[in-house]
Each structure stands twice: as C-alpha cells, then as structure tokens.
Amino acid sequence: MSLLPDRERAPDGDISPQEMVPSRKNVVLVDGVILNGPATDVKAGEKFVEDACRLIMEEVVLKATDINEKVCEWRPPEELKRLLDLELRDAGEPHHRLLQRCQDVIRYSVKTNHPRFFNQLYAGLDYYSLVARFMTEALNPSVYTYEVSPVFLLVEEAVLKKMIEFIGWKEGDGIFNPGGSVSNMYAMNLARYKYCPDIKEKGLSGLPRLILFTSAECHYSMKKSASFLGIGTENVCFVETDGRGKMIPEELEKRVQEAKKEGAAPFLVCATSGTTVLGAFDPLDEIADICERHGLWLHVDASWGGSALMSRKHRRLLQGIHRADSVAWNPHKMLMAGIQCCAFLVKDKSDLLKRCYSANASYLFQQDKFYDVSYDTGDKSIQCSRRPDAFKFWLAWKALGTLGLEERVNRALALSRYLVEEIKKREGFKLLMEPEYANICFWYIPPSLRQMEEGPEFWAKLHLVAPAIKERMMKKGSLMLGYQPHQGKVNFFRQVVISPQVSREDMDFLLDEIDLLGKDM
C-alpha cells in the first residue's frame, strides 16, 4: 500500500503564488515583501508532517525488528546519487515528491535498528529515546541558559548526578557533548588547564613540552585531540599493552619516568574501559596508583565500557574508576539512548569546567537575571548551541528503571557468551581470544584453507576472506558485521551484541550466513 498522497488530485503542499497573497486590501510591502500574515501555508505544513510521521512509523519503526527486511539495500555511490536526485534547484518541490524523497532515503539507508546489524558499537531501537528525539526536534531547544531551556537543563543535571553516583563519586560535575571523541578532548584540555591555568589567557608559549600517556589500544581521538589542542601527536606516548589489549602498568611507570628524565612535563594519563576492537579494560587501580604518585590527571575513556557500571554483575570490569579525575561515558552505545548521547564527567566540584571554558558572553550569561544563574550551565561547554541529548537517556531510564537498564547490559553480555560457545563448536570458526566484554573477535576459515599449515601463505590468504564475505553480505543485505586487521593480526570479524531485539536465533543465523557466504572461497 502506497504511503504517498494520491497524485491524481492536487497534492498537499502545492501552493500557488496567488494563494500566498493575503486577501485584505491593506497589504503592507517592505522591499517588495508582503508582511501580512504568515509566509507559509500552515495547514499544508501540518499535513506534510503528519504524512511524514506515518511514513516513519510504517517504514522504520514497524519494520525495525522484522528479520525478513534487508539490513541494507546496497548501491554504489554514483548510482545512489541518481536514485536520490540530490540536486538543489531554484524552485521548491511539491509535498508528494518530497515524501517520495523521504521514502527513498529510508529505503537506501542502513537499517541500524535491524536485529542483524552488528557493524558498530551502537544498534537497535529504543522506543522511549526515539520519542524523546521526536520531542526535542519539534521543540528545537538549545541548552545553555535556564530561561530558554528550563526543562532540559534540569533533566541534564539529574542525569549527570545519577551517572556520577554510578561512577562512585560523592559529587562531581559534567556536561553532555557531541561524542566520546569530544569528551576525550575536554579531558585533555581540562587536565592541561589544571596543570597550568595561565594557558587559557597566555597560550602555549613558555610552557614546557607537555606529554600525555595512553594505551596503544586507545581510541584514535587521543591523537586527534592532541593535534587539535596544539599538544602535538609526537607528545602522545602510547603505552604497551598485554596480549588481551590492556595497558601494562609497569610500562606506564617506565615511560613516565623516561619522559621526566628527558625534561618533558607529564600531565595526563588516559586509560580505556572497553577498547574499540578487543573490548579490553585497563587495570584502573594500578594506573591510578601511578597517577597519584606522579601527580597526573587520570581520565578514563569509558565511552564503550561505561554501561557495565549499570550491572551489578559486570561493573567489576571498571574496578577503580572512582579514582579517576574524569570519565567519558556514551549512553548511546549499549544503553541505546540514540546517537548521539555522550557525557563528560568530572570529579571536581569547584567549577573547574566553567573556569576552563567560560567566555562570559554578556548577551547570554548576565549576572543580574531574576533567577538563580547557577542553572545557566552553557559556559561550561565549548559549544554555544547544544542539543538536549540527556533527555533521550532520561526518558529511557524513567521508562525502564535502573533494573531495566541493568538487564539490557546483562542480556547483551549473555548473548555474547552464547555466541562464543557456538564459535568454539563450529568447524571453520576460530576465536582471537576469550572476550572480556561484548566484542567477539573471530576468523572464518573457509574449507579451502582448513588443511593448510598456519604459515605466511595461510595468513595472507585468510586476510582476504573477511573483506570478501563483507562485500557479499552487504550486497545481499542479510547482515552487517565489521572486520579489521589489528596489531599484526590479519583481517578478522568483530561482532558486538547491543540491541535487546537480538535473539539466540540471530546469533545462529550470523554463523550460518558467514559459512554460507564464504564456503566457496
């Protein structure tokens, strides 16, 4: 059944210039522009929103858990450009054509809500956070002062307070921002400001060579942040990891001492709780001991692994996180709050964030307002306009409760454990290692390679398998799964369970489909 208006009649939204002109005689013109009444057809606009919402409901929401739908309908870029009609013209298009464009966008977009989308560290559909997104898009708020965003500022404060509690701090501060990469940049800049407050006004001149330490398995945003902030990528010291991808504390101690002997100024250690590929958790207590001994700021990038704090069973993975000075935590990942929903949390409660980032814009942050201006939190952010991302997490948390969020984490990790055991049973599948979290890394070895000795030729051929299977699954639309080479290991698959819509049957299908797509290689 078509969701588009009947094209035989005059479609909604097709407004003639005559219809736009007010019927009254006393038309007011300024620079040739009619100022009487609104310049848009409100009724037609409302009808377009109604039709578009129905399209979203029927084509996205209702099909989100349908395994008979394709995960993606792959088209190469040049073909997709033609199908979407991307050209922007002088004249606008009628609403029936815009709805067709919307339908095309849905059709050719990757269905990240699909139960068989395993490509990234986000997936699935949380209905409550989706409603929250609809609301905030319609209200179009910007979160910087209480006067323009009273509800969302209070919501953000409540969510941050609860997240701080789960980290184990008695009090703290924080801000929601556009991504874990930005959180890591916040941490790097804040640690530098704490080390040398004068840098805010005087800049980098006169400072010693600043150096920071992070895991060799850290997120690539650490290099980007160092470049962006003028610290320099050469001053990011990547500390060796063990075979499971965890930072080795003894190596960290050694590198800090070496840097000091060279005359550099160590100021920050970034540990990782849940690395992107292997899902490794650095030993936080041992790292915190080193930071305390040398007076270094400890930041924990828990963008991926922070959600384990919600689980009484799995929070042990982040043992020692309460000793961190700052934490990055992304509820849009395993807690499914919708991209993007990312918190930067700070143990300090002395307004360090505000002192570091404030610019005291007089048109926003007047101190003689008629209400308590401590609720005007926008000067803690590097942004001015800022989305109310905390609301998505808040509404989902209100709906599910802490116990519901805990169950979400526990179920995801239980399904991951099921997949691990199935991989061990199946011929042609080989685990990289026993997983610590939800990242299941494995090779698929096609029949043609199963009798080969594991020498250079074997690994060279196996390196080609995962990309070829990925191409086949994308073009078929049956599945999406990530792969990568890593630390000297040839291409392997990384599977991550997040969505509660995923079932045991989907785990079985994953392995069956990989075998089906790759057995002739």
From Swiss-Prot:
Spans annotated as Disordered: 1-20
The name this protein goes by in its record: Acidic amino acid decarboxylase GADL1
Organism classification: Eukaryota, Metazoa, Chordata, Craniata, Vertebrata
Positions bearing N6-(pyridoxal phosphate)lysine: K333
Function: Catalyzes the decarboxylation of L-aspartate, 3-sulfino-L-alanine (cysteine sulfinic acid), and L-cysteate to beta-alanine, hypotaurine and taurine, respectively. The preferred substrate is L-aspartate. Does not exhibit any decarboxylation activity toward glutamate.
GO CC annotations, alphabetized: cytoplasm
Known catalytic reactions: L-aspartate + H(+) = beta-alanine + CO2; 3-sulfino-L-alanine + H(+) = hypotaurine + CO2; L-cysteate + H(+) = taurine + CO2
Species of provenance: Bos taurus (Bovine)
Broad class of enzyme this protein falls into: lyase
Subunit comment: Homodimer.
InterPro entries given in the database record: PyrdxlP-dep_de-COase, PyrdxlP-dep_Trfase, PyrdxlP-dep_Trfase_major, Pyridoxal-P_BS
Record-listed E.C. numbers: 4.1.1.11, 4.1.1.29
GO MF annotation terms: aspartate 1-decarboxylase activity; carboxy-lyase activity; pyridoxal phosphate binding; sulfinoalanine decarboxylase activity
Highest taxon in the source lineage: Eukaryota
Keyword hit for Lyase: yes
Tissue specificity field: Expressed at highest levels in skeletal muscles. Also detected heart, spleen and rumen.
Family of this protein: Belongs to the group II decarboxylase family.
Ranges of biased composition (kind: Basic and acidic residues): 1-12
Gene Ontology biological process terms, A to Z: carboxylic acid metabolic process
Cofactor(s), names only, from the UniProt record: pyridoxal 5'-phosphate
Keywords for the protein's UniProt record, in alphabetical order: Decarboxylase, Lyase, Pyridoxal phosphate
